[in-house]
From Swiss-Prot:
Record's function text: Catalyzes the methyl esterification of L-isoaspartyl residues in peptides and proteins that result from spontaneous decomposition of normal L-aspartyl and L-asparaginyl residues. It plays a role in the repair and/or degradation of damaged proteins.
Subcellular compartments: Cytoplasm
Main EC class the enzyme belongs to: transferase
Organism: Shewanella baltica (strain OS195)
Key words, A-Z: Cytoplasm, Methyltransferase, S-adenosyl-L-methionine, Transferase
Protein's recorded name: Protein-L-isoaspartate O-methyltransferase
CDD domains: AdoMet_MTases
Tagged with keyword Methyltransferase: yes
Length: 211
């Protein structure tokens, strides 16, 4: 990570703290992650702005505040095994991989999945398992998960993901069609309780795979 990038990432973490992010481990991970690595060169100059940016295939890299907020919500109970649905650029996975012992991540667009895998390898993050597939279905043979994060908006809460939560596990995801609500769902036995966190805007969670 270059000196300029490090300074920019540290300044971004400070801005996120001012915006309400309080988990110091999350802020540290943000400050150590070169966000420009996850963008095309033409957009690298915008890497440390607190905004979502396009990454191709109709997808985006999420606003850093949302990345930090969802991570903060996910870490509430110190999960050991985490599933991310929607690898995208790999930036969110890079943050999570610094904070949890084991991360599994699914992406339905093959090209994005390949790029993300290469980026995390370059960052020497080796506690991540990648899957090319339909995120609506989760990753059953790696379940149960202590926490699941969905980085695209589901029209309804996917039943498969609920079933793959461990006892006491949490599911953090945006739900809705146009503007969505960020929700945290907690499993207690066979029951699920939900909290609505804030209004957000994500690309839709789409069924199936795309080469």
């Amino acid at each position: 990570m270059t000196r300029v990038a490090l300074t920019s990432a540290v300044n971004l973490a400070k801005k996120l703290h001012d915006a309400g992010i309080r988990n110091q481990a999350v802020l540290k991970a943000i400050s150590h992650t070169p966000r420009e690595m996850f963008l095309d060169n033409a957009l690298a100059h915008k890497a440390y702005e607190n905004t979502a940016l396009p990454i191709g295939q109709g997808q985006t890299i999420s606003q850093p505040y949302i990345v930090a907020r969802m991570t903060e919500l996910l870490l509430h109970k110190m999960p050991q095994r985490v599933l991310e649905v929607g690898t995208g650029s790999g930036y969110q996975a890079a943050i999570l991989a610094q904070l949890v012992p084991q991360l599994c991540t699914i992406e339905r667009i093959k090209g994005l999945q390949i790029q993300a895998r290469q980026r995390l390898k370059r960052l020497d993050l080796h506690n991540v398992s990648f899957k090319y597939g339909d995120g609506w279905l989760g990753w059953a043979n790696r379940s149960p998960f202590d926490a699941i994060m969905v980085t695209a908006a589901a029209s309804t809460i996917p039943e498969a993901l609920l079933s793959q939560l461990a006892e006491g596990g949490v599911l953090v995801l945006p739900v809705g069609e146009d503007t969505q609500q960020l929700m945290r769902i907690t499993r207690t036995g066979e029951r699920f309780s939900s909290e609505t966190i804030e209004t957000v805007k994500f690309v839709p969670l789409i069924n199936g795979e795309l080469a």
